[in-house]
């Protein structure tokens, strides 16, 4: 698949890039993408939820009233799960939600996600650009020139550029990342992917 390279004004530069078929032209595996995205979202969970059992609730050591003769049901503690203010039965405890996915599956998932975007025509390539200062306006104008200002965009750069990253972080629809750090979730969670030209080489080195 070939794509025309655009400039920051949204016009064609006359240059054409060829997408690597091993990355952008594979058969899409929805199951691999599902496994990878599920693990990514699960691994983000802190797992610090905690409810106290009857043994952990403060107090309740003394028997609230005598065993017999009151007419009430027998109770040994005011911290019983049956009492108001008591412990919780089978409540949430701290745990790890981490899920392991094999490297080959993660690789297939990212290739599948990129291939799905390529087949849908949701990949654009722009020439490499730099900004002189941290300003949101130039980045917003680039998106407007490309007709992407109303879409959820993933911009991939060849390397971390602090000025570009900070200039774009105030735009809600824009997510800027380096090509070698992108995940399946990042790809699928965007309406379109905007590659800087040399970022294509970077991602081919990573996923090739």
From Swiss-Prot:
Residues 45-85 are annotated as: Disordered. SUPFAM superfamilies: Ribosomal protein L4. InterPro entries: Ribosomal_uL4, Ribosomal_uL4-like, Ribosomal_uL4_dom_sf. Keywords: Ribonucleoprotein, Ribosomal protein, RNA-binding, rRNA-binding. GO terms for cellular component: ribonucleoprotein complex; ribosome. Residues 69-80 have a biased composition (Polar residues). GO terms for molecular function: rRNA binding; structural constituent of ribosome. Residues 46-66 have a biased composition (Basic residues). Pfam families: Ribosomal_L4 (PF00573). The keyword RNA-binding applies. GO terms for biological process: translation. It comes from the Bacteria. One of the primary rRNA binding proteins, this protein initially binds near the 5'-end of the 23S rRNA. It is important during the early stages of 50S assembly. It makes multiple contacts with different domains of the 23S rRNA in the assembled 50S subunit and ribosome. Forms part of the polypeptide exit tunnel. Part of the 50S ribosomal subunit. Belongs to the universal ribosomal protein uL4 family. This is Large ribosomal subunit protein uL4. It comes from Chlorobium phaeobacteroides (strain DSM 266 / SMG 266 / 2430). The gene is rplD.
């Amino acid at each position: 698949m070939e794509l025309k390279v655009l400039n920051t004004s949204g016009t064609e530069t006359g240059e054409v890039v060829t997408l690597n078929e091993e990355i952008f032209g594979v058969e899409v595996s929805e199951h691999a993408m599902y496994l990878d995205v599920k693990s990514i979202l699960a691994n983000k969970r802190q797992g610090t939820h905690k409810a106290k059992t009857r043994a952990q609730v403060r107090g309740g050591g003394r028997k609230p009233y005598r065993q017999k003769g009151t007419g009430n049901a027998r109770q040994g503690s005011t911290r019983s799960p049956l009492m108001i203010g008591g412990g919780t039965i089978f409540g949430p405890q701290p745990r790890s939600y981490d899920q392991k996915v094999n490297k080959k599956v993660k690789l297939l998932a990212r290739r599948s996600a990129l291939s799905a975007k390529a087949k849908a025509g949701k990949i654009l390539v722009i020439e490499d650009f730099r900004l002189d200062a941290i300003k949101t306006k130039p980045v917003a104008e680039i998106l407007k020139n490309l007709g992407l200002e109303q879409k959820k965009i993933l911009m991939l750069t060849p390397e971390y550029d602090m000025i570009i990253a900070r200039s774009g972080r105030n735009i809600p629809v824009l997510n800027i990342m380096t090509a070698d750090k992108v995940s399946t979730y990042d790809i699928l969670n965007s309406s379109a992917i905007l590659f800087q030209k040399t970022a294509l080489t970077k991602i081919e080195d990573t996923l090739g």
